[in-house]
Amino acid sequence: MSKSRLTVFSFVRRFLLRLMVVLAVFWAGGIALFSVAPVPFSAVMVERQVSAWLHGNFRYVAHSDWVSMDQISPWMGLAVIAAEDQKFPEHRGFDVASIEKALAHNERNENRIRGASTISQQTAKNLFLWDGRSWVRKGLEAGLTLGIETVWSKKRILTVYLNIAEFGDGVFGVEAAAQRYFHKPASKLTRSEAALLAAVLPNPLRFKVSSPSGYVRSRQAWILRQMYQLGGEPFMQQHQLD
């Protein structure tokens, strides 16, 4: 290898190492800060806003209103746990059994990819990372998930998740969603309304709360059954999530 190539390789390596150090410090600071402070915006919100501007849509506004857990109906927390991650109170960020099932499914059905992300993983991804399925992003997601699981309580993870989750075009967080679709604060959401919001979470830009498809309605009904099987509101109290 020539001296010039060695110099370029050395420069690139130093640059990447420094970039990783800067990002690690930034993310560690964010995890520490948002363990107590409200989250003003997420990486997904920034990505959606910038994408809208680049496509000439200057009317788009990624809107979110932060609320604490005592300002959110307990049905909402229960609904997302029932829909997305029923082992949330028990695991340490990763549901190994679900991951194994998803991998087996994806091997058999390459055109229908199934995910197995926990609420903790989704929170880390939505807050700090970009969209995508690359191994690099997955690795960063795993590290950030371990970070928030170590520093934050389960209640804090759920609170942040509910405040940054995407519920529609430009609608982020359960307070903005409750106001947009039901014209009420998140604290007043009913069991059925909470289940409907949770039903669109797999793809909130495709599935609509305002005009739910048959699939969304069937998923809402399934979530309601799962909420009942989990034990209803006492489930949240039992695991100190309310």
UniProtKB/Swiss-Prot annotation:
A Pfam match: Transgly
* Gene transcribed to yield this protein: mtgA
Question: What HAMAP family does the database record attribute to this sequence?
Answer: PGT_MtgA
Organism classification = Bacteria, Pseudomonadati, Pseudomonadota, Gammaproteobacteria, Enterobacterales
Residues in the signal sequence: none
Q: Which reaction does it catalyse?
A: [GlcNAc-(1->4)-Mur2Ac(oyl-L-Ala-gamma-D-Glu-L-Lys-D-Ala-D-Ala)](n)-di-trans,octa-cis-undecaprenyl diphosphate + beta-D-GlcNAc-(1->4)-Mur2Ac(oyl-L-Ala-gamma-D-Glu-L-Lys-D-Ala-D-Ala)-di-trans,octa-cis-undecaprenyl diphosphate = [GlcNAc-(1->4)-Mur2Ac(oyl-L-Ala-gamma-D-Glu-L-Lys-D-Ala-D-Ala)](n+1)-di-trans,octa-cis-undecaprenyl diphosphate + di-trans,octa-cis-undecaprenyl diphosphate + H(+)
- Biological process terms in GO annotation: cell wall organization; peptidoglycan biosynthetic process; regulation of cell shape
Q: What class of enzyme is it?
A: transferase
**Can you name this protein?**
Biosynthetic peptidoglycan transglycosylase
EC number(s)?
A: 2.4.99.28
Q: From which source organism is this entry?
A: Shigella boydii serotype 4 (strain Sb227)
What stretches pass through the bilayer?
A: 19-39
- Record's InterPro entries? Glyco_trans_51, Lysozyme-like_dom_sf, PBP_transglycosylase, Pep_trsgly
